[in-house]
């Protein structure tokens, strides 16, 4: 810990003095609006808008009741350092902080206490604002807001309506030339009315009643309601997005079991943007790791969609008489020996696809057809009995369990056969839970000879295995009894009267098969995406209400803009109904549904007053975080979510930044396929509709590492307070004299290793805390917190203070005499190097170079002003309070916040010191010359040969050989 201020000289830089300096400058910055960024137009317009804009964004925090621990501010201090540096480079810097304030924790606290979540949320925000202000972050406080602010909710709902009132037209051209774009829903309705587009069932749109027309239109909307398989979590009482479910099929929050259920939910048609979301990753400056994660999540693949007729389906009462399957290997169609559909596939029928207990409603044959093998039936007396029982089992499994590659694959025969279009073969159709409804078409063709999973299933269920590929050098050499052949090769036994693939390699065979399928009207080439539509509703109270009402016919109506915002009603019980965590058959009950006076409402939506029912789901927490950076650009605008000119200034493309978006976005990699993907989707929709200047929200992304910590356990395995542990790795660690074990990981109250910024402010001051966090290592790497190591950063700042101020009197000790040549050269080199380090967010190495300069100044009898002032300016982005204080004491009236960052005005100072090169002739020293340490061998030889003693030794002849070892030696070999 820092030294006792009682024993320190009166003007020593202690935690107490640091606190006085820091709060003084924080108050002054706030009073003067030092960090305000000017807009080109509107309430926040000002002269700084003539400067180059630079928009720095942090992933904004959730206002937790626990406040911050020392791990949270790592990215914030880094972005503040960058913001301060860019201001000193002359930029108009937009840098602020809002709060992602809707969400489950505040609601759960409200459930426990009965206190409205808005109260605890606002209290938490106030505490976090206090902690961040005390840290000295240079935020433009005018631009701060919470996603729960009613004006912000207004525009979140407005953006939702833009998505709801749009459809994806694959023929439209986006403003950036991309194929396929969002268009107003009115254009779709016009195309339906004109007959240019027809409903999927081929009916006449104009002959449909109002409800049927609405159903057709809704099937195209980018925001729509779907009764589809979703992730139902009884323990939380809500549904979850795929991304909120862990790999082992449990909720990320609370670790409850998650089940697949068919439920009515709001969805966002993000899949329509799969190609653009994937392609445009090449236009942004993101870590390759994150781009790869998004590409894998989007999951682009190329293949073909093939139609298999199912002749017995209509007879059994099914609504379909064929199955479309997607395959990446259409060249293997001759080897398809069975098909598999997901338990939720509509061809099976049922009361609600995928639900259990609906045997009577299944559209399957009443008895097993001829040729059914015992292994196919699951021991059931009929297809309906077998499939009903199997679907009940599947409904109790999580998606992760069903998709587990290591699990033994199971299934039962449906009693239906599909007809392979290439050879007319009748192949049995199974239902199996490893096929997921929502991926592809929910149906697959199985080629067991060339797929390990299909091969295992075929062996288990006594199904045929037919070869269609083999190694080029021995097409029939692989033993299919031993396993599938999954390598490349050439096609074999793959011909009919119209197409012959035999002997073709994979790509040629695929192309030929797709061409044949298209010509015959049996299929077409297809690009598919693993990405699925975004589940966009929650059975929660503390979220944005949907600006949607439902009429008596079940038709959804968007509220007009003059009815926004829709505010949450006051309710007595904030909790959704939760269930036994393992109750897979339960159904969600949203808390808003209990507010009957709010739910049932009479409105005039243009055709007279009518009674409607409000949507009782709320939006997910992701809604507010999808667009907050745009609101930062124009937070007081009451006419628009953000003004066009202000958006273009801060987020539009410009020289050196071909795609738009924020100049720097810093946050954790854990958001790679959640927030970052959703925000890109909303941005593209708004871009297509002409509301924003570019299709990407974040141009440059930087993922910071994490501050982790050691925790200690005693002999009982109980955690002990980390700050009371003594010892080191050499001597071992003890607590109250007893040995303890050490483990490395996250900070947590239960681990008794939490350290808060408030503790650091009290013990060392904010600047010491900032310097320590930034000097712990490269910003993109995780690092362990060591409170005992903070003193090193304190000593650095204390030495800087002593280099300028007398610790006893507080008087300046700086001299106005010019610095010596050595000092001037070190200052110049430090300026050049620190500038490069700041530009690349290598703040730790910038600090190390500043320490070197400071140590050099400490060694001088008197510290020159022309050396310490550049040092203060260079350190100011990291330790702003101390540097402001020293700058002021050095006689400068204005804040250094916009003081020009030091530059090297005399480039000769960057020329390296010379070294002595020895020049020999036949191994004997003939001359010595001074050269730069970086001189090349070629230049060193030229300089050596020009020296008079060497010219004389050569006597006009060429040397036999010249041996050079730059920069210190040249040996010229001549005839003796």
Language-model segments: which ranges?
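Basic, alpha-helical terminal appendages of large translation-related enzymes
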Residues: 1-49, 444, 464-475, 479-483, ...
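Residue patterns forming the tRNA-binding/recognition surfaces of aminoacyl-tRNA synthetases
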Residues: 2-11, 15-18, 23-24, 28-32, ...
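Conserved oxyanion/phosphate-binding beta-strand-loop segments in alpha/beta enzyme cores
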Residues: 6-57, 87-96, 120-126, 286, ...
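Long, charged, mostly alpha-helical binding arms that flank functional sites
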Residues: 12-16, 300-305, 470-473, 479-515, ...
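Amphipathic alpha-helical
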Residues: 26, 267-301, 346-412, 564-597, ...
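N-terminal catalytic cores of NTP/NDP-binding nucleotidyl/phosphoryl-transfer enzymes
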Residues: 40-121, 145-156, 325-328, 420-457, ...
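Catalytic alpha/beta core of large soluble enzyme barrels
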Residues: 79-80, 92, 349-472, 477-485
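Helix-rich, typically C-terminal accessory recognition domains appended to large enzymatic cores
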Residues: 100, 171-178, 219, 224-231, ...
